[in-house]
Every structure is written in C-alpha cells, then in structure tokens.
UniProtKB/Swiss-Prot annotation:
[4Fe-4S] cluster binds at residues 280, 283, 315, 322. Belongs to the IspG family. Its EC number is 1.17.7.3. Its cofactor is [4Fe-4S] cluster. One of its GO terms (biological process) is isopentenyl diphosphate biosynthetic process, methylerythritol 4-phosphate pathway. The keyword Zinc-finger does not apply. Pathway: Isoprenoid biosynthesis; isopentenyl diphosphate biosynthesis via DXP pathway; isopentenyl diphosphate from 1-deoxy-D-xylulose 5-phosphate: step 5/6. This is 4-hydroxy-3-methylbut-2-en-1-yl diphosphate synthase (flavodoxin). Binds 1 [4Fe-4S] cluster. It comes from Frankia alni (strain DSM 45986 / CECT 9034 / ACN14a).
Amino acid sequence: MTVTLGMPAAPARPLGTRRHSRQINVGNVPVGGDAPVSVQSMCTTLTSDVNATLQQIAQLTASGCQIVRVAVPSQDDADALAAIARKSPIPVIADIHFQPKYVFAAIDAGCAAVRVNPGNIKAFDDKVGEIARAAKGAGIPIRIGVNAGSLDKRLLAKYGKATPEALTESALWECSLFEEHDFRDIKISVKHHDPVVMIQAYRLLAQSCDYPLHLGVTEAGPAFQGTVKSSVAFGALLAEGIGDTIRVSLSAPPVEEVKVGTAILESLGLRQRKLEIVSCPSCGRAQVDVYTLANQVSAGLEGMEVPLRVAVMGCVVNGPGEAREADLGVASGNGKGQIFVKGEVVKTVPEAQIVETLIEEAMRLAEEMTADGTPSGEPSVTVS
C-alpha cells in the first residue's frame, strides 16, 4: 500500500507575498513599496524639554529606532519642535490631537511628518484642505492615525463600537478628503487594544487601498502583555505581507519598544538576525542550569555584530545535534561541556568554564567572519 502525505515538491514560502503599497518618505526613511519594514517609537519626555527629548531620541537611535514620534499637546511643545527636528539624528513625527493649529506648527517647524487623529480634532474635516496644501508645500507626508479609543462619534453610533469596519471606514473617509485636494502622501494606522480586531481592521485596509500601513496595537499594556499582543498581531499581518512600518506600544521605556519591534522583524526574517537564543524549557534530563547558562551567554555576546549562531545545550537528547548545526555550540552533561565549532568537537571543558570558553570562541569566530567580509549585523544563538 502506498501512503501519500501530500508534501509539496518544494518548501512553501515562509511569508506571503508583500502587499504592494505606494512609497512615501518620512525624512530619509522610505516607507512602503519595496522599502524594508521600519521600526518606530515615541518619546515619553515632555516635548517642551528639548534636551531631555533629544537625549531620549539619541538612546532610541542607538537601539535601532528609525523614526520617532513626539507628542504636541501644548504651545510650549509646538515651540520646541523646530529645535528637535533640526537636531534629531532620525526623522521626527509630530503627534497631533485636538488642536489643528499644531499641525501647521509642526509643518512649519520642519518635522518629517505629522500624525493626525481625525476622531478628536475639532472640525478636522473642514481643515483638510489647508493641511493638505501646507503638507504638500513642505513635501511631508501625513499619517492618518485612527484609534479605537477616540473613534469618531458618528461611526460609534453607526457600528455600536470600534469594529474593524468602523476603524477602516474612518481611515478611508479621511483619506478621501485628502484625495479631494490631490494629496496622497499618506500612511494609515487603525489601532485597537484587541489584536484580533486590529488584525481584521488591517486586512480590510489592505484590501481597500494602496497606502502604506503603520502597524500598532494601542494601549497594549505592560512589557510582557504588550510584547505578546504586538508579536501576535504583527506576526500574523507581516506573515501575510501586510505592514510597512511598526511601533510596539509598551508601558515601558521606549528603548524596549524598539528591541521588541526589531526582534519581531528578525524572527520573521525581515531583518538580519542579531543574537538569538533558543533555549529548551528544561526538564529532568538537564544536567546543567540552562536558565543561568543561557542568560550568561546572552549577556556575554550582546552587541556582537556578525551573524554568528551559537548553541548552548543542557542535555544529551538534542544537545549534540543542535550544537553541530551551529557555528559554535556546547553540549553539557556530567559536569562538563563539549565545545563544537562548525560541527566538530574542539575541546571539552569543566562546567565552570563553559561560558568563558564560548565567549572566547565566539570572539575568535567573529574576527574571522569580519576579516572574510561577512555582512555585519547580528549574531544568532541557540540554547536548548
């Protein structure tokens, strides 16, 4: 008897075809089209405190942030925009709510883009023509940022709550107003705190327009909860080819948002991988403290800028096999560790020397890879 498993002749594409979107430029960062998915964050400082804001932007830039947003709730904040936009190493987006006058202030200040929330700016529809002319004159894009928590009351009355359809209709309606003034330098976000609603809304948008999409789960929560929500939502959409720029919203320092966002892109193969640790959950077979060993190796290799794969294994079940598949690895057991380099055992060391030995070997391999012209960027570590 012949059993057919229905396996494809060739591996399926890991991700869906990238959605075609028009490309805009936020400062020197292209968004949409064939441009890589970019990572954004938002300052938590008072925008009026120029020095504090610029210091935080410098930290975000160092962590890999490509575009930063700042809040503009007051005239003092609006007055600070010019200095911030001029001195920031990355493009600055002004985040505007309630007061349309700050949209014009942000454009005049030289911000790279402006985010507007049509749900809470009074008489926003009446100002679209002026905003479109000002933005077009300055050559900057507008982000139409719809949020479930501030949805237009007309749409709440129509749909009863912030449904995917309501979020999408709000965004497309505002786009149509800008289009009436021949302005299409637009990107869109439709954020919701529920990842499922958010995913559905972005799918609707992706089918309805070709504007670039900014992905975000609003009010995602503390670091752990927000990371889970954003990872689920972004992973689902990006795997379908939907999404051109992302911001992970966390009740945590903004640098953490950038780290999580970058890691999501790396996990999907949309960025060259950095230090990656894949560790087993540990079990009764483990003959070493996997948790401690993994954390020590991770800390010791943090910041390495070559795509090096390191395996740190806690038992003999998967250990030798995983270690052989890596550039560098250790299979631990019986108080010692076998060190593998390119699949071959090169030495056996006492357990107390495993971390030190791995770091030394990793540095040596990194130097060799750099000398060989390996693209810098991001080591990969496997722990199990």
